[in-house]
Amino acid sequence: MENLPFPLKLLSASSLNTPSSTPWVLDIFLTLVFALGLFFLLLPYFSYLRCDNPPSPSPRKRKRHLVSQRHLVSQCPTGRRGRPRGRMKNHSLRACRECPRGLEETWDLLSQLQSLLGPHLEKGDFGQLSGPDPPGEVGKRTPDGASRSSHEPMEDAAPIVSPLASPDPRTKHPQDLASTPPPGPMTTSVSSLSASQPPEPSLLLERPSPEPPALFPHPPHTPDPLACSPPPPKGFTPPPLRDSTLLTPSHCDSVALPLDTVPQSLSPREDLAASVPAISGLGGSNSQVSALSWSQETTKTWCIFNSSVQQDHLSRQRDTTMSPLLFQAQPLSHLGPESQPFISSTPQFRPTPMAQAEAQAHLQSSFPVLSPAFLSPMKNTGVACPASQNKVQALSLPETQHPERPLLRKQLEGGLALPSRVQKSQDVFSVSTPNLPQERLTSILPENFPVSPELWRQLEQYMGQRGRIQESLDLMQLQDELPGTSQAKGKPRPWQSSTSTGESSKEAQTVKFQLERDPCPHLGQILGETPQNLSRGMESFPGKVLGATSEESERNLRKPLRSDSGSDLLRRTERNHIENILKAHMGRKLGQTNEGLIPVSVRRSWLAVNQAFPVSNTHVKTSNLAAPKSRKACVNTAQVLSFLELCTQQVLEAHIVRFWAKHRWGLPLRVLKPIQCFQLEKVSSLSLIQLAGPSSDTCESGAGSKVEVATLLGEPPMASLRKQVLTKPSVHMPERLQASSPACKQFQRAPRGIPSSNDHGSLKAPTAGQEGRWPSKPLTYSLKGSTQQSRSLGAQSSRAGETREAVPQPTVPLGTCMRANLQATSEDVRGFKAPGASKSSLLPRMSVSQDPRKLCLMEEAVSEFEPGMATKSETQPQVSAAVVLLPDGQASVVPHASENLASQVPQGHLQSTPTGNMQASQELCDLMSARRSNMGHKEPRNPNCQGSCKSQSPMFPPTHKRENSRKPNLEKHEEMFQGLRTPQLTPGRKTEDTRQNEGVQLLPSKKQPPSISHFGENIKQFFETIFSKKERKPAPVTAESQKTVKNRSCVYGSSAEAERLMTAVGQIPEENMSLCHARHASKVNQQRQQFQAPVCGFPCNHRHPFYSDHSRMLSYAASSQQATLKNQSRPNRDRQIRDQQPLKSVRCNNEQWGLRHPQLLLPKKAVSPVSPPQHRPKTPSASSHHHH
């Protein structure tokens, strides 16, 4: 106290000894507080003024302006310079709005200041706040009343106080701002505290002193803690020592000293280092001596406050920014609860330079509204106070007094490698001061101190709950979770401790001491167990009920609520809340599920659970429940949602099972629906396909037709059905495929031979009506089984029967439709058989009979041909199945076709039936009856059927064969249909009617839907159109016939047609064929002569179709040529002649063949008159067959 002026000492002694000074000090303190509030209120305004119009500092103060300007400019937004002053009002308002927050922060600081000053005043160590004496000199306590001249030099203290002293603006000794403080210990003498600057509107912030030197090692000397401190005022009785830091009004006596300006004589000397105003702005520079003492105390208070605030602030900021090194210098936690001079515990906060710098930065960030006057003292006191603390620390070295400190330091050093959460808990205990009673947390400020309740709560929150309780309890929770840390078990949880702060503080102290006594094992446990424990904590989080199935989580979900564990209570509460929500949700979804509604959210959620849950089951063990063994674990809701009712779980599981079944099989089922539809449609076609065999060849005739027929003999029924689908909707038999043996190929070959120019697509597109009929025309599909179809002949025959069953309507009456197509078919058959059609028996393409009478005839024919077909099927392995499309759209399989009768049936048997108009339906009936009676002699019928089918098939294949053959066939079919419709009509009438029917019915056939009911009508119209077209276009037929054999007579051609019919229908016994040849030999010769002599002439002796195969083919070719020419020249005449001749031929055949062979007779008769048109379509086919 030698350096203190006398008035200050006197004032200090009087203030310390006079208890009555308490009210006065309190008033002064309150005045200071309000002055600070006003200053903060006006400071933003001044700062904005300074930003808008910054004054040019004098050279003397330029450096000081530098720092302050930096601070102020940082507050000023960019671009504020030169802004209109009219907008300053807004800034002022904003500053005013910020003032309350600044005031609150000020109150906070002041309250902390009082809380820190309390222990000093209680212990009577008022003078201990002063800094230590120069090194090597032990300060002595001056007696009460001691005085010194105020002008006494302060040489001994000046060089030491340089870091703290700040030059008075009015002093004549400019300070070197760049000077650095000396490395020795530093003292905060009164002179350093007296250098306070007067408040200025634009308070300049001195640049903070450089980084403090290494003053923190323990000083070698132990100065008297009372040295260099002003004596307590007279009459002042220090309060008894207390273990509490509670501040009472008496504690504020020494703080609320009047603050006046400091005399200039007390300013530091020139050699003082760079410093900062201690409490600039708090008072004027001209003040009484008493103000100096107050300033001294205030500065000392700031020093202590800085240390304490740093501790508290570091405790709050340790999570993110504070370095563990800072806590190495905070061994306060080792102090016991015994009473000690506060100065002996406070200096123990010995931050390193780095830690001190961090603390300063944190203080700046934590108190942004503080004026530079407050920031600089806190910075400087943070540097200077440790100097005085070091003196006191020297009195009691920590190594001697507290041998356990090195262990704690080591433990804290090891905290660098600890997880963040563990570091936080460690930091809490390292920063906490258990020597302070628990009341400090609840009552930081005196009860009568004017602090708002909100600020009070904030102080308690930051200094108490967050700084000490919560973190300590976090560590306790971690230790409780750790298997080996049973010490922390049984201790209150954070929430319970927050309610009872005292107990939690004591427990925190206990835990801290335990860590201090044995830090290494716990540290090892923390290091080894924390990550696992943290992962367990994450798994046990209630929000992961669905995903976490570990033993820990299950135990946490099922363990009873601990009465002494707040965390368990919260966890249980959260779990109950989640369970309630899930129960409500599941109840709602259960109702929806029962109603048949499956919410999308439930689906997705369970899908996600199914994906995540089995994965956890692979590596997680469940203690209470067996782990699911398959991906069906998601269904096992008992594991995941054990809190649900059993009924709800069962329903949910059943729902999940159904959902997964739908999810897995829904798409296949949706795909199977159309497949089933196809299967239903293929019922009839399936048998045909089977009959057709696995041959991969497709009937080119069918392909040539507008209807795309894919023979899927080797493919599955579904694929075959798909391929069988007709491209044109007009075609009504996408499913009906006519299994054709090589005969089909032969038919195709024949049209191939026919020039494509003559063929307008499959069937020459006749008129518009005819074009529409073309698609409907090729109603019969021939599946080229080639000779391979021969395999499974019996099966094919049976399949043919099945096909018949599938097709409700019987096979097309071969005697009728086949007659129309017979000539072409027989010609084609001849053409095919000439090169060896026996093996490649032409599968008779069953032509669709338009007339129900034709259907009946076809039924009869089929029934008649079946025996012969079966016989020949046995003889020949080739399978030729003829699918007859009935008017109803149903297809009938002609077993004779499957048997490839054509191969076995001699061509002589294949008699061309008059495809022209069968005038007399009676004749047809007779033929059918004859067929019925002569089942064994139905070879001619079969050939007729084959011929008809083949004629249709050649016509049906849209290839050249069809077009060429169709031209004559059209005429023939027209005549035939007319004959069927009006069998009694004369040839002329029939021809006209046929044309009319063609013009009228063929057009409706286009319009008619593909329904089976109108299918026959469409077929009729189609054939009529074809016939008419063929009549109109017989040239291609003629060309083909010329290509084949022009020397053959029409009779031979008719016999060839008969052969084709025989081949298509089935194998006809050779005896019948020989008989037919014998009977019709003369007639065939006559017909040949007739055909050869007049090209247009038509042999009436079609009754002799059973001529030698070769002769038949030749005659057929000649007849077809002649018929073609004749049809071209005079189609009407030819038709009439055909109509007449078929009648005659039918009659003759009936007479000759009797009832046994009505078909043969009919083909013969029909062939003779109708052979030209029939030969026309069939001539091309036959010729083409011959060529091929």
Curated annotation (Swiss-Prot):
Chain segments annotated as transmembrane: 23-43
GO cellular component: membrane
Compositionally biased residues, Polar residues: 495-510, 783-800, 943-954, 1121-1130
Basic and acidic residues bias (residue ranges): 138-154, 960-976
Keyword Transmembrane: yes
Region ranges (Disordered): 57-92, 121-249, 483-510, 530-567, 733-813, 934-1013, 1121-1143, 1155-1188
Keyword Chaperone applies: no
Biased composition (Pro residues): 210-241
One Gene Ontology biological process: cell differentiation
Location(s), subcellular: Membrane
Major location (coarse): membrane
Record membrane topology: Single-pass membrane protein
Biased composition, class Basic residues, residue ranges: 59-68, 80-92
Record InterPro entries: SPATA31, SPATA31F3-like
Membership in a protein family: Belongs to the SPATA31 family.
PANTHER family reported in the protein's UniProt record: ACROSOME-SPECIFIC PROTEIN, SPERMATOGENESIS-ASSOCIATED PROTEIN 31C1-RELATED
Role, per record: May play a role in spermatogenesis.
Name under which the protein is recorded: Spermatogenesis-associated protein 31C1
Name of the gene encoding the protein in the UniProt record: SPATA31C1
